């Protein structure tokens, strides 16, 4: 994790990227905000009831003098954001509904990002994934050419660094969806200083098994390679289909996939389903001893990321750094 953060901090030096932290009344978030404010990487915007936040700061002896605090209930920005929300959600929300929704810190924070008053958002310490992601999908939406967002995890142990996806968002994926995730994961890898070698995973290696599931991954590989070329991605390798051992162990790749572009040296792994991805990252985390950083959401027009409700202050800090780096892409 230290190596990844060092790369990102070098990239962010002097940028003071504005990141919204909607859960300012959570002590983990508020402590992380004060730590971030001491850097020149991130300039946090904290949301919540100002009196409650100041009381929490006093309890933990935190200095808030340089931190921007916004209370959605009383903010002078509320009317502007309500109007922008109604316009964005044409025909899907009345002004009265917008006023009520923007009392919610996640909707308010997402509108700050949408209107350019902030560059990214990190939430989830006290909210579900749905509470964090839903406003982003409704307001920020996905990039042109991308039909869905997806969630990757950085799996880190010592000098080893891998990306696993999709592990968090899409329960059902067709070949087109897998292809999009492969290309977006490659872009994410590049933005975090990696040279992506993307393995499309299956229970088959290069046609060793036959089934509709294998065919889907094979079709996804072709679509991903075409999309990477159309997007003019350089220094990106996407290959498959591979069993996991053939993707990561050179001696196995030599036997199972001689001549493949990836010879046991993949660093980005695209799982064939959410089930497989979620199980896979947790096995690597719990049995393999890897730190799992994420989920980092990709495919949105602006970065929004989701914390676990069991997160630590360090998790909030680290994901804020990652979100700021995404904002510079």
Swiss-Prot record:
Identify the EC number(s).
Answer: 2.3.1.8
This protein's superkingdom?
Bacteria
Q: Please list the GO biological process terms of this entry.
A: acetyl-CoA biosynthetic process
Mind listing the UniProt keywords for this protein, alphabetically? Acyltransferase, Cytoplasm, Transferase
UniProt subcellular location: Cytoplasm
Catalysed reaction(s) here are: acetyl-CoA + phosphate = acetyl phosphate + CoA
Q: Which GO terms describe its cellular component?
A: cytoplasm
Q: Give the molecular function GO annotations.
A: phosphate acetyltransferase activity
Mind telling me which InterPro entries this protein's record contains? P_Ac_Bu_trans, P_AcTrfase, P_AcTrfase_dom1, P_AcTrfase_dom2, Phos_Acetyltrans/Butyryltrans, PTA_PTB
Q: Give, as in the UniProt entry, the pathway in which the protein acts.
A: Metabolic intermediate biosynthesis; acetyl-CoA biosynthesis; acetyl-CoA from acetate: step 2/2
* Class of this enzyme: transferase
Q: Which SUPFAM superfamilies match?
A: Isocitrate/Isopropylmalate dehydrogenase-like
Keyword match Isomerase: no
Q: Does the keyword Acyltransferase apply?
A: yes
Family note: Belongs to the phosphate acetyltransferase and butyryltransferase family.
Q: From the Swiss-Prot or TrEMBL record, give the protein name.
A: Phosphate acetyltransferase
């Amino acid at each position: 994790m230290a190596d990844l953060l060092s790369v990102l901090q070098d990239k962010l030096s002097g940028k003071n990227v504005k990141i919204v932290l909607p859960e300012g009344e959570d002590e983990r978030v508020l402590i992380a905000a004060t730590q971030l404010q001491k850097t020149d990487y991130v300039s946090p915007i904290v949301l919540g009831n100002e009196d409650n936040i100041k009381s929490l700061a006093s309890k933990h002896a935190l200095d808030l003098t340089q931190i921007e605090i916004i209370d959605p209930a009383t903010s002078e920005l509320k009317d502007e954001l309500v109007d922008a929300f109604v316009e964005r959600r044409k025909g899907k929300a009345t002004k009265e509904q917008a006023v009520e929704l923007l009392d919610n810190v996640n909707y308010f924070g997402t509108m700050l990002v949408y209107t350019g008053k902030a560059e990214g958002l990190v939430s989830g310490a006290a909210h579900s994934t749905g509470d964090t992601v839903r406003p982003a999908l409704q307001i920020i939406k996905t990039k042109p050419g991308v039909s869905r967002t997806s969630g990757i995890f950085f799996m880190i142990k010592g000098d080893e660094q891998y990306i696993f996806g999709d592990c968090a968002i899409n329960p059902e994926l067709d070949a087109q969806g897998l292809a999009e995730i492969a290309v977006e994961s490659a872009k994410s890898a590049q933005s975090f200083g990696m040279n992506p070698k993307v393995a499309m995973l299956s229970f088959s290696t290069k046609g060793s098994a036959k089934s509709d599931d294998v065919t889907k991954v094979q079709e996804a590989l072709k679509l991903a390679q075409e999309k990477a070329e159309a997007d003019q991605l350089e220094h990106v390798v996407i290959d498959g289909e591979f069993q996991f051992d053939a993707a990561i162990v050179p001696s196995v790749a030599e036997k199972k996939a001689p001549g493949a572009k990836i010879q046991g040296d993949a660093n980005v792994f695209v799982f064939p389903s959410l089930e497989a991805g979620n199980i896979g990252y947790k096995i690597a985390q719990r049995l393999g001893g890897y730190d799992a950083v994420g989920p980092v959401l990709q495919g949105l027009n602006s970065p929004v990321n989701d914390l676990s409700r069991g997160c630590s202050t360090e998790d909030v800090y680290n994901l804020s750094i990652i979100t700021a780096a995404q904002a510079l892409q």
